[in-house]
Each structure stands twice: as C-alpha cells, then as structure tokens.
Amino acid sequence: MNKEYLSDQKTQFNNKVVVVTGSTQGSGAETAKLFAHRGAKAITICGRQEGQGEAIKEQIETIGSKCLYVKADLSNVDDCRNIISLTDKEFGTVNSLINVAGYTER
C-alpha cells in the first residue's frame, strides 16, 4: 500500500471499535488490516480458522490497533451474539460491523 495515502487517512477511524467477520483470510483479513491502518482503536476479527486468525491478530497489533480473535461460525446465532458480547466486554461499544463472511450450503 502507498504509505503517503495511508498516513493521510490515519485518523479516519480514530478511537473506533470495529468488528470484521470472515477476517481470517483474503479480503476479510485485508479489510481488518485497513481499519488498523486507518486508526481503529480496536478490531475484533472472527472466522473458523484459528491458526490464521491468530496470525492476522498479530499483524493488526503490529500496525498499532488492539485486536481480539474470536473463533466463530456465523451460521450459528449463538456465535454471532458471542462476537458482539466479547467485543463489548473487551473494547466497549461496537462502532462498525463489516460482514465479509459468506455461507454456502453443501
């Protein structure tokens, strides 16, 4: 990414708490990292791939945002509620929720 562009945008999400679903890989992971570059105070990432989730969490923390990884299956309503509950307890009110997760019935 162009660092000059990122530095101009650094405070766009300053002090905001963001949840990004489907963020253990691909566009979800990149979206979560972009929020960190844009100054988000804290980001909750979630998905079913725990190893990848922990790796993305470390990358986000290196950028400068706090991060929580929650292993979750978004086809399970209790998991969805748990994501928001854990985020609220850890960081406070959720300001933005971005759904990148998809579901395909097999």
Describe each model-derived feature in a short phrase:
Residues 1-19:
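Flexible N-terminal pre-Rossmann segment of NAD(P)-dependent oxidoreductases
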Residues 17, 24-26, 49:
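Conserved glycine-rich cofactor-binding loop
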Residues 35:
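Aromatic pocket-lining residues of Rossmann-like dinucleotide-binding sites
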Residues 40-56:
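Conserved glycine-rich Rossmann-like NAD(P)H-binding loop of the short-chain dehydrogenase/reductase
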Residues 72-83:
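The beta1-alpha1 cofactor-binding region of Rossmann-like NAD(H)/NADP(H)-dependent oxidoreductases
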Residues 95-96:
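Conserved catalytic-site loops of classical short-chain dehydrogenases/reductases
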